[in-house]
A protein has these predicted regions:
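Active-site-proximal loop/turn and secondary-structure-junction residues that shape catalytic pockets
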Residues: 67-69, 90-91, 111-113, 132-134, ...
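Conserved active-site and cofactor/substrate-binding residues in soluble primary-metabolism enzymes
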Residues: 20, 36-43, 68, 134, ...
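The start of beta-strands in P-loop NTPase/AAA+ ATPase cores
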Residues: 83, 126, 150, 202, ...
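A charged N-terminal "starter" segment
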Residues: 1-151, 187, 191, 195-200, ...
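Short beta-strand segments
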Residues: 64, 151-157, 205-207, 244-246, ...
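Active-site loop/helix belt of alpha/beta enzymes
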Residues: 3-4, 159-308, 373, 410
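Short acidic, glycine/serine/threonine-rich loops at helix termini
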Residues: 74, 97, 117-122, 139-142, ...
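Charged (often Lys/Glu-rich) extended helix/loop segments that serve as interaction or gating elements
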Residues: 268, 274-277, 282-431
């Protein structure tokens, strides 16, 4: 298993994160347990700022809350001078509950409800990322009723293929997100917002997908958008003050993922942005980014207790754990692959070929298939790396499983940031 950030093996042969023995964390908080390396989260934010602050560009970085959000993480984002990209009234409420600056929040979503729009306007968020023609009418009407004026980015789909999983590709022609440039819908969107009485169009947004290595797709999208922006300036006298290119920076889950440094990606994007603006005779807009997975993904680990070990001679050995697809859905949903280890026996030889099985009542509840670990014993602590993004945020109560606790660690100290759900929590809304 490749360790990230402060991850190391201590003198007892245990996995240690943030100066804290992970086995002691399981003893203290139980399992399953999510553990986040707070120092690594902060370091990732600073890597983005370091490159962009030297670029000569005006820029803004918004953390993509859908990857993982909780009050403590919002506080950290505030301290690291990050904005927030939220996609629901729940994420917005979470951010506002710790007095995050609403002007540094923007609201996404392909089907924003009237309640969400009204709540966002009342909260004075920085801007809406408009996703459809119907939404233009909705925001304009509700804004007029409330006496509020909204700022908006229009989300466009540039028709660029991202080489990633089908379910997390968002910038191609057939997408539920945004308005298409090629078929004229995006232009209709621009015209509709410019006509609106209660909306100011301040820029454009696109996002071609997630878990992307390299910048070929992003550069192609930037170039295409700038050609289109030149047409908009000539025909509609519209100039985008902001270009938000989303996120999607990939992380390393296994050796199959080819690492692509954030610094290299950002330098290439910045160069492309400047050259594209220059070639079209346009001013360089403010650059907005929305990293999520690349901020928290490698900082997160999930710890489980090993339970039943079942050998099917000549076929497979199943090592079952006390969690599963209720807290780790990405393997079942995407076929995602992960590295695993025994956190209490990190120095031992990976001699056994096994499949890690979750405890949910589904044959497809597998965490990792045909992986090597030391010969497992009941009570061992299994660790899955790189579970910081799209794990707790996608967790469910399937089989009425309790969602795990979440702990942040840093400088030898641990802090509970989300409590484990109780049995009472599972039924408190039932009548």
């Amino acid at each position: 298993m490749q360790l990230h950030g402060s991850g190391r093996i201590n003198s007892q042969g245990h996995l240690e994160i943030g100066g804290v023995d992970t086995c002691s964390l399981v003893d203290k908080y139980g399992s399953p347990l999510f553990v986040y390396d707070e120092g690594l989260i902060r370091d990732q934010c600073r890597r983005f700022h370091k490159v962009l602050s030297k670029s000569g560009l005006d820029y803004h970085i918004s953390y993509a809350s859908k990857a993982f959000i909780c009050k403590e993480l919002v506080r950290i984002m505030k301290e690291e001078d990050m904005g927030l990209d939220v996609v629901s009234v729940g994420e917005l409420y979470n951010a506002l509950s710790v007095d995050f600056d609403s002007q540094k929040i923007h609201l996404h979503g392909n089907n924003k409800t009237e309640h969400e729009i009204g709540y966002a306007l009342e909260s004075n968020i920085g801007c809406f990322v408009v996703d459809s023609l119907a939404e233009v009418e909705r925001i304009d009407r509700i804004g007029g009723q409330m006496g509020k004026r909204a700022k908006a980015l229009l989300r466009v789909t540039p028709g660029v293929e991202a080489h990633t999983h089908e379910f997390i590709t968002t910038g191609n022609t057939d997408s539920k997100f945004g308005l298409n440039i090629d078929n004229g819908q995006a232009r209709e969107g621009v015209e509709a917002i410019l006509r609106a009485e209660n909306i100011d169009l301040i820029g454009l947004h696109f996002h071609i997908g997630s878990q992307i290595f390299g910048t070929e797709g992003s550069q192609a999208a930037i170039k295409k958008v700038f050609v289109w922006l030149k047409d908009l300036k000539e025909d509609l006298n519209f100039e985008a003050k902001i270009l938000n290119i989303g996120g999607g920076f990939g992380i390393r889950y296994t050796d199959e993922d080819v690492s692509y440094p954030i610094e290299d990606a950002l330098e290439e994007i910045i160069t492309c942005l400047k050259e594209s603006a220059r070639s079209q005779g346009l001013a360089i807009p403010q650059l907005w980014l929305e990293p999520g997975r690349s901020i928290v993904g490698e900082a997160g680990y999930t710890l489980y207790r090993v339970g039943t070990i079942k050998e099917i001679p000549g076929i497979r050995t199943y090592v079952s754990i006390d969690g599963g697809m209720s807290d780790h859905i990405r393997t079942a949903l995407y076929g995602a692959k992960y590295e695993v280890a025994l956190a209490n026996r990190m120095n031992e030889e990976d001699a056994s070929l096994v499949t890690i099985a979750g405890k949910c009542c589904e044959s497809g509840d597998l965490i990792a298939k045909d992986v090597r670990i030391p010969e497992a014993k009941i009570g061992d602590i299994l660790v899955v790396a790189c579970t910081g993004a799209y794990h707790y945020s996608m967790a469910s109560n399937y089989n009425l499983m309790q969602r795990p606790a979440v702990v942040f660690v840093r400088d030898g100290k641990d802090k509970i940031v989300i409590k484990r759900e109780s049995l009472e929590d599972l039924i408190k809304n039932q009548v």
